[in-house]
Every structure is written in structure tokens, then in C-alpha cells.
Amino acid sequence: MKLSKRGEYALRALIDLGIASELGWPMLQASELATKEKLPIKFLEQIFTQLKAAGYVKSRRGKFGGYSLGRPMNQIKFGAVIRLIDGPLAPIRCVSQMAYVRCSCPDEVHCGLRMLMLDVRNAIAKLLDRYTLADIVEITLRKLRRDKVTPPFLSRSTKLRSVLPPVLNRLGDGGRKFNSVGPTSGKRRK
């Protein structure tokens, strides 16, 4: 599996929409996201078309329009989004669950390479299917607060100090139980 630029930008856009939603900005314009992510707006709009067709985002036209999340963040799994944008997670097609193609190996059942790649595919799928957009937004918000950084698309009129503390208070632990890769057992990472 290799994450394409299209897949990377789709995930980053969803994270931005999730952060904006948590911070009280339910709609973001494509131009704001394109500026933040430094990519052509037409490319981002193509990505949003795919995400919208699958129900991950919704849009509203007009001066105050833009894009927002189409589902609750805890229902958006990273594995599903990557499969939508980039296709199967499998490193070789003979281990794919979405696009299986028999390989050239004469004995597929006993092929060592296939067994290894099946383990790789399963590990990737398990990890990506475990994380939801809510998980990543929560981790990101905690890091932003810790580092006192304002998301670029919120700098237009919102200050970090007034917005992030109430959000983190709703999270319950003030950001202490998450490290850079996910939940910890109450220990802080050094």
C-alpha cells in the first residue's frame, strides 16, 4: 500500500474539517483548505466530489457556503477513506480483499511471499481501521493546545486561548492521556 497524494490530501482535508467543526466552524471553504494545504483548488474540489459521493462530506453553495463533515467523526475510519480514494490496502493483489487477482505463483496456498504480504495487509488494515477521524482530531487538538498553535484557517477571527480550552475540557482529561500516536495508560511521553 502506498498513500497517494490524493489520499493524503483527502485525509488532511477531513482532519481540517473535523478540527474546524470541534472549534465551532462547521463550514470551511475549499479555498481556505487549499491555501492551508498548498494545493490547487481544482484538485481539492475533485477530492471533495469523491468524499461527498461517499457521504463523508457535504457542501453548501453560496457566499457563506463551503464543506462540512457528512457523518459524525467517530463513524469515519481512516481505512475506509483510503480504500475509497486509493483502492485496496494490499501490497500485492493476490492478498487483496477488494480486488483479488490470482498471482503467477504455481502454489498460491503455500507461497511464502503471499503469506508474508497477507500479514502485511492485515496489519495495515487493522491499524487504519482502528483509528477514526474523532481519534485523530482529538490528538491534534491536544498537540495544538500544548504547543499554543492556532490552526491557519481559524486565525481569521478566533484565538486559540479562547477556543481550545473549552474543547479540551469536554474531552475530560485536559489532553494528558494521549501521546503522539494514540492513547496511553495515563503516562506522559517524554
Please tell me what each predicted stretch does.
Residues 10-24:
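Short amphipathic alpha-helical interface segments
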Residues 27-38:
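A short alpha-helical element within helix-turn-helix/winged-helix DNA-binding domains
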Residues 35, 52-53:
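Alpha-helical residues within the helix-turn-helix
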Residues 48-49:
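Short, hydrophobic-biased segments on the C-terminal half of alpha helices
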Residues 55-70:
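Beta-hairpin "wing" of winged helix-turn-helix
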Residues 72-172, 177-182, 189-190:
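Non-DNA-binding regulatory cores of transcription-related proteins
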